[in-house]
Amino acid sequence: GTLHSQLSSCYLTTVPDDLYGIYGAMRDNAMLSKWAGGLGNDWTPVRGMGAHIKGTNGRSQGVVPFLKVVNDTAVAVNQGGKRKGAVCAYLETWHLDIEEFLELRKNTGDDRRRTHDMNTANWIPDLFMERVMNKETWTLFSPNEAKDLHDLTGNEFKEQYEKYEEEAKKGNIKAHKEVDAEELWRKII
């Protein structure tokens, strides 16, 4: 046994889109890792790079700089010296930062935007795979402008996603980017 037994060996959390929530999640990660817990963090709610921040009237740096801190925290805390810290970051395929997220584990590029000790994974909706097979485009959104996508699946997701695409074309959604679905798929695999 251990002095601090846990009810679970792995903890899955969703990180909110505000600094208190983001750094609270990092603190929670450190404490859970201290007692040998593995971690999975859903970063989808955090606004994408370039998205407007109302409180400061500035622009977001996106999820990647925060993931670098999470990576380094896992290395520093290392599950109480028992084994290497285990953390995985998750992001949905429609998130504005997905392309940079897919680069996190590469050995080339700016090391300040790499997480060599963290695993990454992303959720892929059926609609994305349809777009890949049909050689169509895929639109990336910042979750602060597409708030409910993260909670939808199936036809509900498809209907809302396509509404957001129309709103983006009309100029009503500022933080978005259209990409080739097949090209994004190649980056994923």
Label the model's feature ranges.
Residues 1-8:
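N-terminal flexible segment immediately upstream of the FAD-binding catalytic core
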Residues 8-189:
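Active-site cavity-forming subdomains of large catalytic enzyme subunits
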